Amino acid sequence: MKKINVGIVGGSGYTGGELCRLLLKHKNVKKIYPTSRSEQTFERTHLGLTNSNLNFIDVESLISKKKIDVVFLCTKSSQSIEYAEIFLKKKITVIDLSGAF
C-alpha cells in the first residue's frame, strides 16, 4: 500500500495531538503536517509526543503543498466548512472531526 502524506488543520488542540499520536504509529503514513497559529513548538504543545520530529506549519503553507493525500479538520465547525471547500477543490480527501458535516 502507498504511504500517504497527511495534513492536520488544528494540530495544536487536543484532537489534533491525539491524531498525531495515532498517525505517528501508522505504517502507511509517510509525513504529517500539523498546523497551528501558535508560536510554541510541537513538542512543547504536546508534551507526550517528544522526539516526534513534527513541526507546526501555518494553514496557508499546508494549502500550498503539492503532495497531500488527506487532510483532517480538527477545528471549530465554522472553520471546517471553510477549509473543507478549499481542500476538496484541490481534490484532497477531507476528514472532518469537528462535526460540521
Model-derived segments and spans:
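N-terminal Rossmann-like NAD(P) cofactor-binding subdomain of oxidoreductases
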Residues: 1-101
